């Protein structure tokens, strides 16, 4: 793709995200979502591969339907209340339609089927954008309307997302699909707490974005898309493979790594809200995700590829690791000691 075109699409992506998260009017928020959608489509289909074109088409159809539902929800609310303010969403039908629309945009169960297919048809850098930046505007809308949404509906969607995100990722061999189901599972944790402590949802999203960026950039650096090729990477970049191992365990939520912090705080908040059963369900369902994270980590660092010589190292010099990957992997694994400070800030 032309560098100038890529720059224009990236700026449009940032502009659409900024418009949505900073607006109070429904039409402006909708316009920001549309700018985002139109900016990401060329980035998804830039390889001109049939899978990429198919992914872009699926993404466009899903996001167009979700955007239409957002507009319909805001118009229904304005019809009954005379308000276009995002925080004044009070009509029950509008709340229900908006929840459905945002679930479609995020890829929450039962509207999740498009996300793994789109991520599989995209490059790793575009997949990173789809998993992080593209989820920020819908989560911002959830944050702004959290006090009027239906807790029972959101809790049901969240537990189903955590269950299916873990369960459907078990038999995957494509790394992008595994990361897509990982994203669906993490969205379940973010969604269940949005009504009770919205700031905790944002903290969870920020930490998830950091860890996911570290994983995607590492995989992009070692040019790995399948589990079978992941098994041979540690001979080329042993230090990077070791950090990938720790980052994957952090994504799984194992202490004493960064990913344990949001899960710990969410379980604590759910217990305070007399939702101990939901907390137990999420904790048990996270074991499904732990299995495929361990599978990835095992392939990245422990298994040995078939070899016929005693020399495992390649003869050529490896490229230096990007400083951004080093910083992201460090943050993704070492934030837990300052968790008391972080928990008092939210």
Predicted regions, residues:
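Core, highly hydrophobic multi-pass alpha-helical transmembrane subunits of bioenergetic inner membranes
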Residues: 1-346
């Amino acid at each position: 793709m032309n560098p100038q075109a890529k720059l224009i699409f990236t700026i449009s992506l940032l502009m659409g995200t900024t418009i949505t998260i900073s607006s109070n009017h429904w039409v402006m928020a909708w316009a920001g979502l549309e700018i985002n959608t139109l900016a990401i489509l060329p980035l998804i289909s830039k390889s001109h591969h049939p899978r990429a074109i198919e992914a872009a088409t699926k993404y466009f159809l899903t996001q167009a339907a979700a955007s239409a539902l957002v507009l319909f929800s805001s118009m229904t609310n304005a019809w009954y209340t005379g308000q276009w303010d995002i925080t004044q969403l009070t009509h029950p039908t509008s709340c229900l339609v908006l929840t459905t629309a945002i679930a479609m945009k995020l890829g929450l169960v039962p509207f999740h089927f498009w996300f793994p297919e789109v991520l599989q048809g995209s490059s790793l850098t575009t997949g990173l954008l789809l998993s992080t930046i593209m989820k920020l505007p819908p989560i911002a809308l959830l944050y702004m309307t959290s006090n009027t949404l239906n807790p029972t509906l959101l809790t049901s969607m969240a537990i189903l997302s955590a269950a299916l995100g873990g369960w459907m990722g078990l038999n995957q061999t494509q790394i992008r699909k595994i990361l897509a189901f990982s994203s669906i599972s993490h969205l379940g944790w973010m969604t269940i707490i949005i009504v009770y402590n919205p700031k905790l949802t944002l903290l969870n999203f920020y930490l998830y974005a950091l860890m996911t960026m570290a994983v995607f950039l590492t995989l992009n650096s070692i040019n790995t898309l399948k589990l079978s090729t992941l098994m041979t990477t540690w001979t080329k970049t042993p230090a990077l493979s070791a950090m990938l191992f720790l980052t994957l365990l952090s994504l799984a939520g194992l202490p004493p790594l960064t990913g344990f912090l949001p899960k710990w705080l969410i379980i604590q908040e759910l217990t305070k809200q007399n939702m101990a059963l939901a907390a137990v369900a999420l904790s048990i369902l996270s074991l499904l995700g732990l299995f495929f994270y361990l599978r990835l980590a095992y392939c990245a660092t422990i298994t040995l590829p078939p070899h016929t010589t005693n020399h495992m190292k390649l003869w050529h010099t490896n490229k230096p690791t990007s400083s951004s990957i080093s910083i992201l992997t460090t943050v993704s694994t070492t934030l837990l000691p300052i968790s008391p400070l972080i928990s008092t800030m939210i």
